[in-house]
Swiss-Prot record:
Membrane-spanning parts: none
Region annotation (Disordered) ranges: 13-44
Entry similarity comment: Belongs to the UPF0102 family.
Any Pfam family matching the protein: UPF0102
Name of this protein: UPF0102 protein BB4515
Domain of life of the organism encoding this protein: Bacteria
SUPFAM superfamilies: Restriction endonuclease-like
Record InterPro entries: Restrct_endonuc-II-like, tRNA_endonuc-like_dom_sf, UPF0102_YraN-like
MF annotations from Gene Ontology: nucleic acid binding
Amino acid sequence: MTDTATRLAFARAAQAQRRLHRRPPASPRARPGARDGGSPTQRRGQAYESAALRWLARQGLRPLARNLRCRAGEIDLAMRDGEVLVLVEVRVRAHAGYGGAAASIGASKQGRLARAAALLLPVLLRRHWPGAPPPVRFDVVAFEAGRPHWLRGAFWLAEHAPAQGRRGQDAQGWRVR
């Protein structure tokens, strides 16, 4: 085989491999709940996010955005509490077993939220904060048995934590109070 023929054979083989591994486009029928606003679980989550948004607004926070998505994950709610940007994770558990809704946000989930926030922060700041970037606080609204529990300041983004009250950082860069 000549050099050109070998390259052509490899190119055809690579093309055939790509064809084999190509996924068919998802049709609306292939995605569960695509036409009716999502699966029952998604609709339930959206209802609790709406309830959390209304509840936090009654507590004095101002809504900025909801369901912010990027490749690193999703931020359920973005709100403003005075001069603090508050990113809210909404969790729901029917029963308090295994620690309940708030306990389901471990170190790995906090890391995903922080990575998503790092990617989404420039857009949020451009839209809602002219000037110096504000402190960024993560709150959790945990619904257990239908009742909201607000964990204010569950964790902070290390580079956007307020100066007062700092006691240091843990191994992942979270502010420890």
